[in-house]
Regions:
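Non-catalytic, usually N-terminal nucleic-acid engagement modules in DNA/RNA processing proteins
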Residues: 31-212, 326-329
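Glycine- and acidic
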Residues: 181-184, 189, 246-252, 361-364
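Short, positively charged and aromatic/hydrophobic N-terminal segments
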Residues: 20-27
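N-terminal amphipathic/hydrophobic targeting modules at extreme N-termini
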Residues: 1-8, 14
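C-terminal extensions of enzymes
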Residues: 31-48, 56-62, 71-72, 176-182, ...
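Conserved, mostly hydrophobic/aromatic
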Residues: 54, 87, 122, 164, ...
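Glycine-rich phosphate/ribose-binding loops and adjacent secondary-structure elements
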Residues: 193, 205, 209, 217-335
Length: 406
């Protein structure tokens, strides 16, 4: 049920009252990051992020719910079976549909989608980057055409922060430009400097426009600089100087070799504050996730587990399975005996292959639940091995297996 604006103001007022009462009695709902264990043989760390909507153990993988839904997966499956601790929404897509008016009347994205755990929203910079043929970038912001109906829109740092206030995510990303790969040095530097100026405007806007729903939102600025070490260093130093609740690394996993990505991540993590969470945007394969955890990354997201699932690729601890292959047609063993989620032991490989062959959407749903369950299991295991002190040995063993084609 959508709320009237009067009802929404009433709700916001009382939620703010309860928030203040909680602080009086020692319950601070502002985001907090605690490091619990530092790995002795890598830069991996075990920690927890505390938000108004719950705690997030780190390292963590965040399923992507671009338009307010993780494709093919119910919220109950996400929370109870997959055990996602935080999900993503996207400012660009949510702005176009359903729009900020609907979201505000619903009481924010949490209430609109029925999700009571933390949410992070991307600023839409990557989506605008992907619309290279229909957008123009200037100092004021980005003019682009909707992929839905071709209508023209303008994103500026101020308008994007306003949209993210209306969405109401716990963690909101600063507006930035994601550069392509390869990218000329001159363009990468100019883009990075503009991203820094946009960040200053984001910070100013948020300081003058408080949260709408009675709980705090934490801004994460984004390090850019393409694959140039000097630019990444300059950007990381700028981002570190802001003193934000957390920091992100963007502009990677856009086509550069994995070794280059790891080099940039290692460089930037050595500059960003160690007492704040580090979020690597848009990454990646299971092996990418483990390697970046070893470099000091705490948070990652990617559409890969669900996108690949819809194409019949399953990730497992022993390697990847293309369930469409004929070899699985009469394999009546469970999808995965490891049982990351209930679907893994409820259905057989032969049945799942049949669903894909028959183009039944249920097959894509089952594969999506499995892959997300595996990704969340993988980071849970990473946390356990950091705690146990053998993360590096376990990581090297897992990476060798993860790239195997079964």
């Amino acid at each position: 049920m959508l709320w009237s604006k009067r009802q929404q103001r009433f709700f916001n007022a009382w939620q703010g009252v309860f928030l203040r009462i909680g602080r009086i009695f020692g319950k601070d709902d502002y985001m907090e990051f605690q490091i619990q264990v530092l790995d002795k043989n890598s830069k991996a760390r075990l920690g927890v992020i505390k938000t108004a909507h719950g705690e997030i153990p780190t390292p963590i993988f965040m399923p992507v719910g671009t338009v307010g839904s993780v494709k093919g997966v119910h919220q109950r499956e996400l929370s109870d079976d997959i055990n996602a601790r935080i999900i993503l929404g996207n400012t660009y897509h949510l702005y176009l549909r359903p729009g900020t008016d609907i979201l505000e009347r619903a009481g924010g994205l949490h209430r609109f989608i029925g999700w009571d755990r933390p949410i992070l929203t991307d600023s839409g910079g990557y989506q605008v980057y992907s619309l290279s043929a229909t957008r123009k970038i200037k100092e004021e912001g980005v003019k682009f055409k909707s992929h839905i109906d071709g209508s023209s829109h303008i994103f500026s740092p101020e308008s994007v922060m306003g949209i993210e206030r209306s969405i109401g995510a716990d963690i909101i990303m600063a507006f930035d430009e994601c550069t392509p790969y390869p990218c000329e040095y001159s363009y990468a530097r100019a883009s990075m400097e503009m991203t820094h100026r946009w960040l200053d405007r984001c910070v100013s806007y948020l300081a003058e426009h408080p949260e709408k729903y009675g709980y705090p939102q934490s801004l994460f600025p984004i390090v850019q600089g393409s694959t140039y070490r000097d630019l990444r260093r300059i950007s990381a130093e700028k981002i570190a100087s802001v003193g934000a609740d957390g920091n992100a690394i963007g502009g990677l996993s856009v086509g550069e070799p994995h070794e280059v990505m790891y080099e940039m991540v290692d460089l930037v993590c050595g500059i960003l504050p160690s007492d704040r969470p580090r979020y690597l945007m848009g990454v990646g394969t299971p092996a990418n996730i483990l390697e970046n955890i070893a470099l000091g990354i705490d948070m990652m997201d990617c559409v890969m587990p669900t996108r690949n699932a819809r194409n019949g690729m399953l990730f497992t601890a022993e390697g990847t399975i293309n369930i469409k292959n004929r070899k699985w047609a009469d394999d009546f063993s469970p999808i995965d005996l490891a049982g990351y989620t209930w679907v893994d032991t409820a259905y057989t490989k032969a049945y799942l292959r049949h669903l894909f062959a028959a183009d039944e959407f249920l097959g894509k749903q089952i594969a999506s639940v499995h892959n997300l369950g595996f990704y969340l299991w993988l980071v849970e295991q990473a946390r356990e091995h950091i705690k146990a002190g053998d993360f590096s040995v376990w990581k090297d063993m897992m990476v060798r297996k993860l790239d195997t084609r079964l």
